[in-house]
């Protein structure tokens, strides 16, 4: 029986013919909504957010890279997102609304278009088993999208604390706060480069009075419209901010390849009105764009393992229910 269950967890999924960089694709979760899966520094575990079929809110879970050992590490209260391991694999941090109450905060109103809710998240640090959680930000507006510097000393994250969605850094104890971006618009989803000298992120900055008014109006309601975003890179101190892509549509979830020279990200630029996002790889200077996934379903939130040998991402492929999002892992083939 144990071997049968393990075989189910390790279910192989065929790659599309155009997915030449992906070998030995395995599906790690089955059912519900699963996303934002990130490797531990050792590459042995994955932390991700999961909304089970009978639950109304995302919580943080950890599992081994073969899909075994699945367990919840957040409190089960409120909504959580953006979990990440510290460099010692023994601690984690994530964003949660649990301080505002145990209930799941309501979903946004989509009657005027697709929007993301900017819930009252704060960032918490906990042991890897979920015990000992403590709050390291205390801000009445959105603090989330946190990731860790390679040396383990700095958290980079997105905050609405000054009335705009900007990127900040802080120490792992929540001190030494520094604002890195100041242009009106959504700067978010930051990750450090492997050497810690750069930060890759997604951004959209309104260019017209109408776009600025729409953005400010939504921000006042703790909402943002994520339909136009491009990939950007800046130095870790916030200088030399430069746009990498100019594709149109929504380009998000960027992550550096371990070589520090390339960036993988998700995009729907081929059909900006579609949910058919695919993964793309591009040089950090914006050259040599290459499509990685060719599946007709949603593919996003990619992350390379620390050694660059594996890729983990979230996808609607192979779902038993339309729109179901699961976590997949594949061996990365560098030169097919």
For each of these PLM feature ranges, what is it?
Residues 64-68, 127-131, 171-175, 235-239, ...:
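Short loop/turn segments that connect beta-strands within beta-propeller blades
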Residues 1-7:
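Sec-dependent signal peptide recognition
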Residues 30-33, 49-60, 75-80, 95-122, ...:
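A flexible loop/linker signature enriched in serine peptidases of the S9 family
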Residues 13-32:
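A short helix->beta-strand "capping" segment at the edge of beta-propeller domains
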Residues 46-47, 92, 155, 199, ...:
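Hydrophobic beta-strand positions that form the internal "hydrophobic ladder"
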């Amino acid at each position: 029986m144990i071997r049968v269950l393990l075989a189910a967890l390790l279910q192989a999924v065929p790659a599309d013919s155009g997915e030449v960089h992906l070998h030995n694709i395995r599906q790690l979760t089955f059912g519900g909504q699963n996303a934002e899966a990130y490797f531990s520094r050792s590459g042995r575990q994955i932390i991700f957010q999961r909304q089970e079929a009978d639950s109304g809110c995302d919580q943080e879970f950890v599992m081994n890279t073969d899909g075994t050992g699945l367990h919840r590490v957040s409190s089960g209260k409120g909504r959580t997102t953006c979990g990440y391991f510290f460099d010692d694999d023994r601690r984690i941090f994530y964003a949660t609304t649990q301080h505002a109450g145990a209930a799941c905060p309501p979903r946004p109103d989509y009657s005027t278009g697709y929007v993301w809710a900017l819930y009252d998240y704060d960032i918490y640090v906990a042991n890897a088993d979920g015990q000992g959680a403590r709050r390291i930000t205390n801000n009445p507006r959105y603090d989330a999208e946190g990731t860790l510097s390679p040396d383990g000393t700095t958290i980079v994250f997105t905050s609405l604390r000054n009335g705009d969605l900007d990127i900040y850094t802080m120490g792992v104890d929540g001190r030494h706060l520094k604002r890195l971006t100041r242009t009106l618009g959504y700067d978010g989803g930051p990750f450090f480069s492997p050497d810690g000298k750069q930060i890759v992120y997604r951004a959209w900055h309104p260019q017209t009075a109408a776009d600025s008014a729409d953005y400010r109006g939504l921000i006042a309601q703790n909402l943002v419209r994520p339909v136009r975003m491009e990939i950007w890179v800046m130095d870790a101190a916030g200088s030399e901010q430069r746009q990498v892509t100019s594709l149109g549509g929504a380009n998000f979830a960027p992550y550096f390849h371990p070589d520090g020279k390339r960036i993988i990200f998700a995009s729907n630029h081929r059909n900006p009105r579609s949910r058919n996002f695919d993964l793309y790889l591009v040089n950090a200077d914006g050259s040599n764009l290459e499509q990685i996934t060719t599946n007709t379903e949603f593919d996003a939130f990619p992350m390379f393992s620390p050694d660059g040998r594996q890729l983990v991402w979230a996808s609607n492929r192979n779902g038993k229910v339309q729109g179901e999002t699961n976590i997949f892992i594949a061996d990365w083939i560098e030169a097919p």
